[in-house]
Amino acid sequence: PTYSVMKDQNKCNNMQHLSKRLNENGYSLQYIHGGDVDFTNQKGFLRSGNFIDIVRDTDFPITDRLSKWGVPDGIMFDYTLNLITSEETLSATQPYFKVLQTLSSHEPFDVPFHCLDDPYCNSAAYTDSCLGAFIDSLKVTPAWDNLLVMILPDHCYAKYPETMQNHELAHFRIPMVWTGGAIKSPRIISTIASQIDISATLLNQMGIDHDDFVFSKDIMDPMLPHFACYSFSDGFGFVTD
């Protein structure tokens, strides 16, 4: 399978969006990315999810666009931190949903940072250091107490280790971390799931109806069948508990 739903605007307009459901329930929306949001119809996809406030590469001076893809993650994390901790945001009564999409760990891995010789590992270490500094800074602000931060990648890097093949299951195994003052207590969940299950899981925790998200399953519901699908250029896979 090589078809991309995001490139089909008609499908984008007629599918369920987590952001749209949150917006319908009173949340303001903002999408933050240091790259080109017109790439592969990303902007069209975001618009169909009710994102109007979209921050992109051209919103930053040319001196900040230091990589092939745009503005490095360090600058973007600092920008997002300033937004969340601003007096305007802290004093606002409307809840918000902000998405920060990173880009520095993408090929060609040209980051303003060096601690490892392997280019990919070095870029991942850079983004990780930026994320860690972001979380550490948030923890000492008033914003942290009621904040939920969700962290997840889209996929692993197919060329690390070098022996990994594009179809291998390990290429699609990714973590998801929830943190923030809104988390009541630590917990590890080993349920098989995929990104499509984020909507039902989050909305159920918030007490928001998600019955029309028919493909999404609540990861925390032990009574549901848990599985995940994945695809690559020449095939697809199915994983269960």
Give, region by region, the residue ranges found by the protein language model.
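Solvent-exposed soluble domains appended to multi-pass membrane proteins
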Residues: 1-241
